[in-house]
Amino acid sequence: MAQDPEARIKELEAKVQELSDREAIRDLRYRYHEYVNEGKFADIPNLFTEDGELDFAHLGHAKGRAQLNAFFGRLESQPPQAGDRQVSLGISFVKQYIHNHVIHLQGDRGTGFSYLEARPIYKGESYLVAARYDDEYVKQNGQWKFKKMGLVPHFMVPLREGWAQEDRIKMGR
């Protein structure tokens, strides 16, 4: 039995909307990493809702626009000290790479996770970082935003030591 054309159109429109939403959420995650990698920390809070929340374990917490601005403001570059361009958390360089972004949608809300590899210089030393981002998303005024972003570290260790040790979280302590 052939499907009603109007019903088929509605079904296809819903599928296109879901694909568009998934792509917009991927773009949101990609923009976050672009801003980190390019040092555009002041732009990051705009990726969150006004009451957005950040939980980066021992690296810090922030809730609401004022706290998000303060948190990412701490990452803004400070004047060079002794020839090195340092930031207030002790990170003078960072490049992040994400993998396996999984998204679950329910209308104008969603959750997702992705895996992180990062190469920061922390307090003058090269580090290796592996972690998982756990996100909550919400669509507001046609745009997807982070409602909550969590970071679950797997390891944060000096490059010279590697991660084959019991204490795998050495950055930010």
Question: Residues of each region from the PLM?
Answer:
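Short, low-complexity N-terminal intrinsically disordered segments enriched in polar/charged residues
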Residues: 1-34, 38, 46-47
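Charge-dense, low-complexity intrinsically disordered segments
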Residues: 15, 19, 62, 124
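Short, hydrophobic/aromatic alpha-helical segments in well-folded domains
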Residues: 28-31, 43, 132-136
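A short, glycine-centered helix-capping/turn motif at helix boundaries
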Residues: 37-40, 140
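A solvent-exposed, acidic/Ser-Thr-rich amphipathic alpha-helical stretch
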Residues: 41-115
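Short, charged/polar micro-motifs that form catalytic or ligand-binding hotspots
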Residues: 34, 58, 127
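A beta-strand edge to alpha-helix "cap/lid" segment located at domain peripheries
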Residues: 3-13, 89-173
